[in-house]
UniProtKB/Swiss-Prot annotation:
Gene3D superfamilies: Metalloproteases ('zincins'), catalytic domain (3.40.390.30). GO terms for molecular function: metalloendopeptidase activity; RNA endonuclease activity; zinc ion binding. Its EC number is 3.1.-.-. Single strand-specific metallo-endoribonuclease involved in late-stage 70S ribosome quality control and in maturation of the 3' terminus of the 16S rRNA. Zn(2+) binds at residues 120, 124, 130. One of its GO terms (cellular component) is cytoplasm. Binds 1 zinc ion. Belongs to the endoribonuclease YbeY family. Keywords: Cytoplasm, Endonuclease, Hydrolase, Metal-binding, Nuclease, Ribosome biogenesis, rRNA processing, Zinc. It comes from Acidothermus cellulolyticus (strain ATCC 43068 / DSM 8971 / 11B). It is found in: Cytoplasm. This is Endoribonuclease YbeY. Its main location: cytoplasm.
Length: 164
C-alpha cells in the first residue's frame, strides 16, 4: 500500500504513527495492497477554505475525505486479486488545530484525536457514513474497533508509545 503524508499545518505530529495506522486500517479492511492513500495535515485557514468550498459549511472542521476510485472493503472469504490494477483510494485532510480543541474536550492527546480522525476519514473513503443513526452506530463501532486493535497490536509488538 502506498500511503503518503504531508504536514503543512505547522503543528508537530507523529506522522509515522499516522502512516502505520493508515496501513493497518487498509490491511484490516482488505483493501488491495496496491491502493494509494494521501493524508494531508493543514492549518485552520486552509481547512476553512476546503470546508466551505466542498461542504458549503463555514469555518474549519477536523477531517475531510475526498474519495477518488470507488473502493470498498474486501471480504475475508475472498482472496485479493493480485492482478488487479492499482487504485487511488483518495485523500484524508486533517486539521491538527481543530483536533487539539476536540482532544482537550475529550480528555486525551492531540495525537490520539488525530489517530481517531485518520480512521474516521479512511472509513468515509470506503463508503461509511454517519448521516443516519444506524449507519453512525456501525461506523463509530468499526472506528473504535480498528483503533483499539491497532493500539493493542502496537503494544504487543513493543512499538513506541503515543507522542503527547
Amino acid at each position: 500500500m502506498t500511503v503518503e503524508i504531508a504536514n503543512e499545518s505547522g503543528v508537530d505530529v507523529d506522522e509515522l504513527r499516522l502512516l502505520d495506522l493508515a496501513r493497518y486500517v487498509l490491511d484490516r479492511m482488505r483493501i488491495h495492497p496496491l491502493a494509494e492513500l494521501s493524508i494531508l495535515l493543514v492549518d485552520e485557514g486552509e481547512m476553512a477554505v476546503l470546508h466551505e468550498r466542498w461542504m458549503d459549511e463555514p469555518g474549519p472542521t477536523d477531517v475531510l475525505s475526498f474519495p477518488m476510485d470507488e473502493l470498498r472493503p474486501g471480504r475475508l472469504d475472498v482472496e485479493i486479486d493480485p492482478d488487479a490494477e492499482p487504485a487511488v483510494l483518495g485523500d484524508v485532510v486533517l486539521c491538527p488545530a481543530v483536533a487539539k480543541q476536540q482532544a482537550r474536550h475529550a480528555g486525551h492527546s492531540t495525537q490520539d484525536e488525530l489517530e481517531l480522525l485518520t480512521v474516521h476519514g479512511i472509513l468515509h473513503l470506503l463508503g461509511y457514513d454517519h448521516a443516519e443513526e444506524d449507519a453512525e452506530r456501525e461506523m463509530f463501532a468499526l472506528q473504535s474497533e480498528l483503533l483499539t486493535a491497532w493500539r493493542a497490536d502496537r503494544r504487543i509488538a513493543g512499538r513506541p508509545g503515543r507522542k503527547r
